[in-house]
């Protein structure tokens, strides 16, 4: 991993990097640099750029209905549960993007099993995972950024993405202004004209026989004309005008290139001479400062030894006092635990007492209240009235029953006397 993790080795040096020995073991631990804590921010920014190249906004965020994370989302702790879910889903998408089948994790899945599956896929790509799986359970940190960055690189390799060379901007220099547009020749035009002249010369060299015949005829004509007097037919004013017209076109401007190695070599020589001259002056001061620092460190070490020897008894007393303090703290913790238990029992007893008091108050209020007594009196009065009415009804019923019995008895006697006919009465008729 590119992040500055603590690596255990068996030697004091590996790849020219100094290492310090761990206390109590024979192993050697790689020292973390001062910028190791900020390396995960760089990895996270690279991860965001790689995800943009993989079009994760269209293919992952919109389909999963998720919010786009910030540039340092997995580097800083915000919401561990949300970050862990985002890490698992993004890792699964990157694994599928890299050509490996991987099921999308759900919220109810076991996090340990999910992390184990992700790490196994990471090792199958040939990447190292020399850290405990619990580092990924938080959902943020350098290990989370490392795992996602590895999956993003594998996905880019699978889709055949290649990084192109950077295109540096061309620095444009100010050119001299000329009245006419085409009054200036550049170095490219000069090269083109030079190439055209070379091609013309080659064509002339090919037709050597024709050239010899032409030169022979010209020599014959010149020998015939040498007998005449040579006179110039050129006008001086026209010649000067032609020179003034052609002169701007003959000007050649060569652009200076800032990337020319000659300029850099000169600058390097200048810087080297400046460094050597400055080193001669500062070397003496640096040597003097080094000697003073060495003497000061020796004095500090000797003073530390003297102070340790002088304060050894006080240090022992301090350690004994620390031990007594720890024992007192333990006893205090034990006593505090008993007090807490008794306080809990007291609170329970107080609750029961409050309940009893409340019940007593309710009963006392019910006893002192006259409303129930009034109700009882009213009920008794009503019962008495009902009893009188019932007695009257009973008397009426008894009287009616007695009358019915007397009437029945009289009817019976009447019937008995009506059925017996006296015999002497019949003889007189």
UniProtKB/Swiss-Prot annotation:
Coiled-coil features, chain-numbered ranges: 304-369
**Region called pDED, residue ranges:** 335-426
One matching Pfam family is: IFT57
Q: Does the keyword RNA-binding apply?
A: no
Q: What GO cellular component entries does it have?
A: axoneme; centrosome; ciliary basal body; ciliary base; ciliary tip; cilium; dendrite terminus; Golgi apparatus
Major localization class: other
Which keywords are on file for this protein?
Answer: Apoptosis, Cell projection, Ciliopathy, Cilium, Coiled coil, Cytoplasm, Cytoskeleton, DNA-binding, Transcription, Transcription regulation
**UniProt entry tagged with the keyword ATP-binding:** no
Q: Could you state a single Gene Ontology molecular function term?
A: DNA binding
Subcellular localization is given as: Cell projection, Cilium; Cytoplasm, Cytoskeleton, Cilium basal body
For this entry, list what GO says about its biological process: apoptotic process; cilium assembly; heart looping; intraciliary anterograde transport; intraciliary transport; keratinocyte proliferation; motile cilium assembly; negative regulation of keratinocyte proliferation
Q: So which domain of life are we looking at?
A: Eukaryota
Disulphide bond pairs: none
Q: Describe tissue expression.
A: Present in many tissues such as brain, thymus, lymph node, lung, liver, skin and kidney (at protein level).
Q: Which disease is it linked to?
A: Orofaciodigital syndrome 18: A form of orofaciodigital syndrome, a group of heterogeneous disorders characterized by malformations of the oral cavity, face and digits, and associated phenotypic abnormalities that lead to the delineation of various subtypes. OFD18 is an autosomal recessive form characterized by short stature, brachymesophalangy, pre- and postaxial polysyndactyly, and stocky femoral necks, as well as oral anomalies and dysmorphic facial features.
Its assembly, as annotated, is:
Component of the IFT complex B, at least composed of IFT20, IFT22, IFT25, IFT27, IFT46, IFT52, TRAF3IP1/IFT54, IFT57, IFT74, IFT80, IFT81, and IFT88. Interacts with IFT20. Interacts with IFT88. Interacts with IFT80, IFT-81, IFT74, IFT172, IFT70B and KIF17. Interacts with BLOC1S2. Interacts with RYBP. Interacts with HOMER1; the interaction possibly prevents the pro-apoptotic effects of IFT57. Interacts with HIP1. In normal conditions, it poorly interacts with HIP1, HIP1 being strongly associated with HTT.
Domain comment, as recorded: The pseudo DED region (pDED) mediates the interaction with HIP1.
Free-text function comment from the UniProt entry: Required for the formation of cilia. Plays an indirect role in sonic hedgehog signaling, cilia being required for all activity of the hedgehog pathway. Has pro-apoptotic function via its interaction with HIP1, leading to recruit caspase-8 (CASP8) and trigger apoptosis. Has the ability to bind DNA sequence motif 5'-AAAGACATG-3' present in the promoter of caspase genes such as CASP1, CASP8 and CASP10, suggesting that it may act as a transcription regulator; however the relevance of such function remains unclear.
PANTHER family per record = IFT57/HIPPI, INTRAFLAGELLAR TRANSPORT PROTEIN 57 HOMOLOG
The Swiss-Prot or TrEMBL record describes its family as follows:
Belongs to the IFT57 family.
* Name of this protein: Intraflagellar transport protein 57 homolog
In which organism is this protein found? Homo sapiens (Human)
